[in-house]
């Protein structure tokens, strides 16, 4: 399971010209599900995303997690993160989870974060989305479990 996280000052996701999820300060989480992923990996990754210290403390050191910084999550499904780009000029998605598997784990990820008290907005699974963001830093990390 893969989460590409970006520290943002604002982010939003639109579907059919309508904003369906938006945050100010926080993390944009692009979430990719791989074929071998399960609920155990989902929980491990969700905890890592919520605990990862990428926000600056009073000394300017990356020492605060999203909750400590008063931020929120915007979680967007992105199966292309599971692409194999090692050969040729076209990505292979053979390692990506099936749509049914990915939807279940995506929804579990969101529900888990919300159950932990994390303010969480979402995109729409499998929709054609337009994601806008202001990357703060820029700060971007690729987390995998």
Swiss-Prot record:
Reactions catalysed: glycyl-tRNA(Ala) + H2O = tRNA(Ala) + glycine + H(+); a D-aminoacyl-tRNA + H2O = a tRNA + a D-alpha-amino acid + H(+)
Cell compartments where the protein resides: Cytoplasm
Classification via Pfam families: Tyr_Deacylase
Top-level taxonomic group: Bacteria
CDD domains for this protein: Dtyr_deacylase
Keyword flag Nucleotide-binding: no
Keyword terms of this UniProt record: Cytoplasm, Hydrolase, RNA-binding, tRNA-binding
EC number from the UniProt entry: 3.1.1.96
Gene Ontology CC: one annotated term: cytoplasm
Any one GO MF annotation of this record: tRNA binding
Gene Ontology biological process terms, A to Z: D-amino acid catabolic process
Subunit structure: Homodimer.
Similarity-based family: Belongs to the DTD family.
Domain-level remarks: A Gly-cisPro motif from one monomer fits into the active site of the other monomer to allow specific chiral rejection of L-amino acids.
Name the UniProt record assigns to this protein: D-aminoacyl-tRNA deacylase
Source species: Shewanella sediminis (strain HAW-EB3)
Gene giving rise to this polypeptide: dtd
């Amino acid at each position: 399971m893969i989460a590409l996280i970006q520290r943002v000052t604002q982010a939003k996701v639109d579907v059919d010209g309508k904003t369906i999820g938006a945050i100010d300060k926080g993390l944009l989480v692009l979430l990719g599900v791989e074929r071998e992923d399960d609920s155990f990996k989902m929980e491990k990754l969700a905890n890592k995303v919520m605990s990862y210290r990428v926000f600056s403390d009073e000394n300017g050191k990356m020492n605060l997690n999203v909750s400590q910084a008063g931020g929120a999550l915007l979680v967007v499904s992105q199966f292309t993160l599971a692409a194999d780009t090692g050969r040729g000029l076209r990505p292979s998605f053979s390692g990506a989870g099936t749509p049914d598997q990915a939807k279940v784990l995506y929804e579990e990820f969101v529900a888990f974060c919300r159950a932990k008290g994390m303010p969480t907005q979402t995109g729409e699974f499998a929709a054609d989305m337009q994601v806008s963001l202001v990357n703060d830093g820029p700060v971007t990390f690729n987390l995998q479990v």
